Amino acid sequence: MAKYEILYIIRPNIEEEAKNALVARFDSILTNNGATIVESKDWEKRRLAYEINDFREGLYHIVNLEATDAVALNEFDRLSKINGDILRHMIVKLDA
């Protein structure tokens, strides 16, 4: 299984309940498509290098996972692009 890290930035004005629901939803998208989540944690609220959608700060969330194929990653990528609460995301394959 290949190891991946996903970092995504959530809009800073989201309510805590909505943020937890968003994280749970995207974690379940990964697991329902065959990935195994090793760790999913909030990093911190950070100032952005440049303004994104009129926001100067964002809530960073990191997910470490293992996957045998790209199905889960492609579905995460597709859904995070159309979700208004996620400002940016990045998927990186880690060295084994």
Curated annotation (Swiss-Prot):
It holds the Pfam family Ribosomal_S6. One of its GO terms (molecular function) is small ribosomal subunit rRNA binding. InterPro entries: Ribosomal_bS6 (IPR000529), Ribosomal_bS6_sf (IPR035980), Ribosomal_S6_plastid/chlpt (IPR020814), Transl_elong_EF1B/ribsomal_bS6 (IPR014717). Keywords: Ribonucleoprotein, Ribosomal protein, RNA-binding, rRNA-binding. CDD domains: bS6. GO terms for biological process: translation. GO terms for cellular component: cytoplasm; ribonucleoprotein complex; ribosome. Binds together with bS18 to 16S ribosomal RNA. Belongs to the bacterial ribosomal protein bS6 family. This is Small ribosomal subunit protein bS6.
